Amino acid sequence: METKHTKFPTPPWDMEIAAERLVFEETTWNSHEPDKIIEGYADNIEMRDGVEFINGKQELKQFLKRKFEKQLDYTMKLDLWGALKGRMAVRFEAEWRDASGRWYRNYGVQVFQFNDHGYVERRFASQETISIEK
């Protein structure tokens, strides 16, 4: 069982309650603080983000540190497309810049599976990245 004291909606949920849970995801990811983000994830998290595979909270924390060192000024918007029991399907877009100042946008989909306590157990994201003008 998870030891964090974070409170958020737990499954099973409808679209409205699932959207409330996504607020936590969006807010913490936009904080760029790995310790805050991993509060919403199970210790045994299994995750794929693009071409990276992550297993466990410590790998997730290291992945996030690398991500935010490379993807500066990262902002993400999540759009719930479906929710059933402890699963969600989400469309997302994110913008960020690299160290040279060039801006990018990611478009993609994420699927989540949550445990009974509301922690993400599985998260798989497929995305494409395009260069944009700011």
Where are these regions (language model features)?
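Short, low-complexity N-terminal intrinsically disordered segments enriched in polar/charged residues
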Residues: 1-43
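A beta-strand edge to alpha-helix "cap/lid" segment located at domain peripheries
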Residues: 2-13, 61-134
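Structured beta->alpha junctions
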Residues: 26, 51-52, 80-82
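Short solvent-exposed beta->alpha transition segments
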Residues: 46-68
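Short beta-strand segments in beta-sandwich/barrel cores
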Residues: 45-46, 95
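Residue-level signal for short amphipathic helical patches enriched in basic/charged
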Residues: 32, 48, 115
